[in-house]
Structure formats: structure tokens, C-alpha cells
């Protein structure tokens, strides 16, 4: 039993289970917020069954992206993330590649079992994640934009093509802005390893430019945070209250660190705050829906 666990654990680690779980929650939340029920024209079936399938499809796609990224970023990770399974030798690159392919196939299969529409919709993140790992990660901003867009797409994926998906556009924009900032911070955090591997990323931009991008995106997010409830009226005061109590303090905290000229010393803390803010934002949407539903 112990040997089996030792074999399985590295495969779990390579998927970044927490990130995959957050994506799965975003998909499920999007479906719940819009009251989504898959029409017969798009495959039909029980709502609960389709919800499970689409959550699995999204989580498998996220896991695929992380696995294939580790395969192609092995040299970088030797410096930036020496504890990752491929670097430690817990998994071979061949085994990781096969595992990634299996995850991609699982994502498509689960989405197709829900509907043909979602089978097509699942191909988009898989294609973009592949492009990101092979090429876009090695660009100054394109890769950051793609990953941020895919995170926002997770909130929309489950509810498409339901017309109520429109209420998720503002939250998806917020998710995009927040994750764009997080990707910038991660690039700075991984700068040493990326340079050692000869890669060009957003971390190669001048530090004042990176700080400006963080503050601009963070500032727009701060202003837009209130749009879903106070401007559009798609969500209520519960959403606003959770944002004030949980989202806003985290947002201000990492932005204060971004203002520092030596902000690159605090990327670990900033990254943790940004991830916590993402979870808090999802919680704000969920709490509002829960209160007004029950």
C-alpha cells in the first residue's frame, strides 16, 4: 500500500491539485449562478450528471496544462522549483507526457459526454494550454494574457450556451485581471530559473514596467469589483459585503507590496494573497447566490 501511495502522489502533485480544484469550483459556481440546465439540443441528460462531467473536464484540462508545462519546463524547474516530481526523478518525462495525454483525453471525453457543444468548448483551453507551454510561456506578455483568459473562461465554461451567462461577464473580467497580476508575479518569482534556461518572460521587462502593469490591472480590478452589484445589479449586497470584508483587504495588501521598489522580494507573499483573493471572490459570488436562494 505504501509503495502504491509513493507512486501515485507524484502524479497528483504534478497536476497542482489546489489549482485544479479552484477551476472545478469556478465551473460549478458558474453553472449554479446562471441556473444552467443543459438543453436537449446540446446533449441533454440530468443536470447533476452534466455538472459533474463538466467539472471533471475542466479539472482534467487544468491538470493537463500543469503536467505538460512541467515536462517542457524541466530545466527551469531545476532552479525555480527543485522539489517538483520531474526534477526529483519521482516521475520520468515519458511517463509525465503519457499522463498529460491521458488527462487531455479525459477532459474531451467528459465534455463530450455532457454535450457536443462542450466537447468543442473543451478543445479551446487544451489548444491554448499546449501553445502556452510550447511557445507563449516564452514571451513577455502573451502567455500571461492567455493563462489569465483561461482562468476567466473557467467561470463561463459550464454555463455556456445558457443566455444567463451574461451575468458572469463582469466576474470573469475580474478573474482575468486578478490572474494577469498573479502570472506577472509568478514570472518574477521564477525569473532566475527562466533565465538559466534561456527563456524570455514578462520578468525580463524593466521592474518599473512590471510594477506599473500590476498597479494598472490591480487598480482597474479595484474599481470594477463593485460593478456586478452596485452598477449592473446582477448580485446583491451580500456580494458587496464579502468583497469589503475579505476581498478588499487582500487586494490592498498585495497592491501595497507592489508599490515597493523591492517588490520582487515579496513575490511569494503576493502570489499567496492573489490566490486567496481569487477564492474570496468566488466565495462572494457563492454567498450572495446562497442567501438569495435559501
Where are these regions (language model features)?
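Multi-pass alpha-helical membrane architecture of UbiA-family
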Residues: 1-294
